[in-house]
Amino acid sequence: MSLNNRWTVEQRYRRLEQIPQCDIEEMTLSRQQDKGFPSFHIAPKFGLLNDPNGLCYFNGEHHIFYQWTPVGPVHGMKYWYHLSTKDFIHFTDHGVGLHPDQDYDSHGVYSGGALVENNQVLLFFTGNKRDQNWNRIPTQCFATMDSDGSIEKHGVVIENEHYTEHFRDPKVWKKGDDYLMVVGAQTKTEHGSMALYQSKDLKTWQHKGPIKTKFSDLGYMWECPDFFEINGQSVMLFSPQGVSSSNPYDFKNIYSVAYIVGDQLNLESMTLENHQDILQPDYGFDFYAPQTYLDESGRRILIAWIGLPEIDTPSVTHQWAGMLSLPRELTLKDGFLVQTPLPELKSLRKEEVVFAQSHTLESTSCLIQLDLVGDGFELELSNLKGDNIVFSATEHEFMLDRRYMSHLYAEEFGGIRKAPRLDAKQTIDIYIDNSVIEIFINGGKHTMTSRFFIDDLNKVTLKGLEQARLFPLKGITGLFESAK
C-alpha cells in the first residue's frame, strides 16, 4: 500500500516553506539513524527522491537534478533538487534548483531533461497544475541556468492539445538546426506513446505525433522518455506502465523500463526505421525512470531512480525514500545497451579482500566480483538470524531472491527476479550499499537493481565458486551541505 493513501491532499502538497523546522529536524534525525541509508549513492536528506532530471555536463561538472518531495517520504509537491560533481565522489549540494512558484507549476515541477547550448543549460520540465476539481493541467515548460548557477524560468512552451492529462517528462536534443523534444504521453485511446515535437527557436513547437513502432499497443502510458543516438543507431528508452509478460523474465514489476534500437528516426513518416524487438535493461526489483546525457568526452551516461511509483519501501519509517543508481556508461553491442559503472567509481575502493565460502562483513558498503566459468553458484547476504537475500545462477539463468529479508514489501509482485544468462564465462560486479544492490551481468547487457532490507547484515556466503574478490567502498562526500 502506498503512503499516498494515508496522507491527505493538503498534507502531501505542503510547500517546503510551510514545513515547520521541528518537523525537518525530526525527519533529518530519523534518516540519520537509519542503518540502511546508503553511503555511496545519492539519496535525499529527508522526504522522497524519485526521477533523475536535467542531467548534463556543464562548466567542467556533471549536473544532477532529481525530483524531491520534502514534506515526507510520499509523492506530493515536487521540486528539482540540484547537485554537481567533477568525479562522482565529491559533490556540491546546490539545494533546490526549481521551485513550484508559478501558476503553471502550482502543484509541482515535474520531470524533464537538459540541453547545454551557448554557455547555458536549457532546462525543460513539466508544469503540473490542478484545477478546483483536481483535474490535471500539464504543460511543457522551459528554464535556463547560467554559468554562475542562477536559474530563470521562461514559462510554458507547449500546451497539451493532443493527449490525455498524462503528458509529461520532456527530453530535448538538437539535430542540425532543429530542436527535437520527446514527451511521455497517453493517447486519447489510452495507449502509451513517445510524442515528438520540433522547433527552430525553442519557443514555437510543432507537434509531429507519436513515434511509430510495432509496439504501439504496449501499455497505457510511457513515462520518462529518452531518445538518443549511439554507434550510429537510434535508441528509444522509456518507462512503460500497464505491461506484463508470460515469459519468466520480462515486466515483472508494477512498472518497468524498456528500450528499442533502430536505424534512424524518419521525421516524415514518424517511424523508427528497422527497429528490433523491445528489450529491458534491468531485471531487478527497483529500477525506473532512467535518463541519459553526454559528458565532455562523449560518453553516454545513464542514471536511474532506484524505486518505483506506488511502492513504499521500509525506509519510509525513517522519513526518506528513493535513491539514484550509480552512473553507468552506455555502449551498444550485439543490439544490447551495455551498462558499465563509470571508472571514476574505482576511487571508492579500499584494500581488496579475497574470500572463499564465507566472510564476515566489516562494511555493508562494498563491491564483490565473481568470475564465472560456466557452473552455477550462490551468493548469500545474511545476518545472525538467517534473514537473507540470495543471488544465484544456473547454466541458463540468474536469480535474485529476497523472500527472506528482515522487512518485506511489494510482496504482491513476487520475491524472485530472473534474468537470462547469455555467456558461460563472465565477470560479475555486485555493488552493495547497506540497503541496495546493483548487479552487472552478461557483460553489462543486463543489470539487476534492487533494494533489500536485512537488519544487522554481517555475512556473505559463497557456494559453487572457489573464491570471490571483495572491496570495501568509501562513501561519497558533499551531500546535505547546502545553505539553501
UniProtKB/Swiss-Prot annotation:
An annotated GO cellular component: cytoplasm
Question: Matching InterPro entries, A to Z?
Answer: ConA-like_dom_sf (IPR013320), GH32_Enzymes (IPR051214), Glyco_hydro_32 (IPR001362), Glyco_hydro_32_AS (IPR018053), Glyco_hydro_32_C (IPR013189), Glyco_hydro_32_N (IPR013148), Glyco_hydro_beta-prop_sf (IPR023296), Suc6P_hydrolase (IPR006232)
Per UniProt, what is one Pfam family of this protein? Glyco_hydro_32N
**Reactions listed under catalytic activity:** Hydrolysis of terminal non-reducing beta-D-fructofuranoside residues in beta-D-fructofuranosides
Q: Where in the cell is it found?
A: Cytoplasm
Question: Enzyme class, one word?
Answer: hydrolase
Keywords linked to the UniProt accession: Carbohydrate metabolism, Cytoplasm, Glycosidase, Hydrolase
Q: Which residues form the active site?
A: D51
Which positions in this protein are listed as binding substrate? Answer: L48, L49, N50, D51, Q67, Y110, S111, R168, D169, E223
Induction section of the entry = By sucrose.
Q: What is its EC number?
A: 3.2.1.26
Major place of residence = cytoplasm
Pathway terms, separated by semicolons: Glycan biosynthesis; sucrose metabolism
Q: Which GO terms describe its molecular function?
A: beta-fructofuranosidase activity
Top-rank taxon, per record: Bacteria
Q: Which GO terms describe its biological process?
A: sucrose metabolic process
Family according to the record: Belongs to the glycosyl hydrolase 32 family.
**Physiological role:** Enables the bacterium to metabolize sucrose as a sole carbon source.
What name has this protein been given in UniProt? Sucrose-6-phosphate hydrolase
Q: Which organism is it from?
A: Vibrio alginolyticus
Q: What is the lineage of its organism?
A: Bacteria, Pseudomonadati, Pseudomonadota, Gammaproteobacteria, Vibrionales
